[in-house]
Amino acid sequence: RLAHIFISHLHGDHCFGLPGLISTLGMLGRTGGLVVHGPKEVETYLRPVMDLFCRGMEFEVRFNPVDTRSHSLVMEDRSLSVYSIPLKHRIPTCGYLFAEKPKEAHIIREMTDFYQVPVRCMKDIKQGQDYVTPEGEVVPNSRLTRPAAPPKRYAFCSDTAYNRSIIPIIEGADLLYHEATFAECDLARAKETFHSTARQAAEIARDAHVKRLVIGHYSARYEDLSELHREAEAVFPGTILG
C-alpha cells in the first residue's frame, strides 16, 4: 500500500534507510510504482545506489523534486493534499503538511429508505443537496445525512532551527511533530547546528495553536529525556515524547 515516500533532507539519519527499503520491496514482489518526494539531491544520491543494488525490480521508482524554499503543493489524490514547509537547517530542508480533504456526509440509511430516495440521488445528497419527493415535499439534507468527521492536518517539521515563519503554514494543525534536539542549557549548540530546543518546539506549537505536539530527534547526549519533556510541557501542556 506504500505509494509515496517524503524525504526532508539529505542527512544520513533521514535517508540512509531508503535503498534498503526499496530493495526489500522489490524482493517482496512489489509491482506498483513508488514516488519519492524530496529535495532534488535525493535522486542524485539514490540513483547510483539503486543501479548497484536494486536492479531487476518489477516496479518503477519515480522522483518528485521539491522546492525546499517555498510552501507549495507537493502531491494530492482524492483524499489528501501534501504541502512543503520551508525549514531552516544547514542544507536544503523541508517539512511536510498532510491535509485531509473534506469528506462527504454519511447517508442515514433508515431515513433514505423511509423517503424512498432513489439510488441516483444519493451522490447529490452526500454533497449537501436536499431531496424533493415526487409529491413535491422538500426533505432537508440534515434529515438524511450525518456530517463527516472534520478533515485533519498533520505537520512534520524536522530538522530545523527555531523558525517562526512556519507558524502561518501549520496554524491550527491537529498534530505537529517538531524536532527538539536540545535542552535550553544547550541553546548555543542548537543555534550553531541549526536545530531546536524542546522549549522552542513548544513555543511554535503554542503560537500556531496546534492541538497536539509530538517532539523528537533528540541528541544522544540526553540519556534521560525528562528534562526535555519538562521544558516543552511548561510551554505546551500535554506534549508527547516521540
Which residue ranges define each predicted feature?
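Metal-dependent catalytic neighborhoods of phosphoester/phosphodiester hydrolases
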Residues: 17-24, 223-231
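Metal-dependent phosphodiesterase/nuclease catalytic metal-binding core
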Residues: 67-215, 226-230, 235
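A glycine-rich helix N-cap at a beta->alpha junction
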Residues: 53-66, 238
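An N-terminally biased module of ancient metal coordination in phosphate/nucleic-acid-related enzymes
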Residues: 7, 21, 195, 222-223
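Active-site neighborhood of phospho(di)ester-bond hydrolases with catalytic His/Asp-centered motifs
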Residues: 2-11, 39, 154-160, 177-179, ...
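Arginine/glycine-rich "motif VI" loop of SF2 helicases in the C-terminal RecA-like domain
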Residues: 25-31, 51-58
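Active-site metal-binding motif and surrounding structural segment of the metallo-beta-lactamase
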Residues: 1-37, 65-67
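Short, well-ordered alpha-helices that flank and scaffold nucleotide-derived cofactor binding pockets
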Residues: 23, 48-51, 203
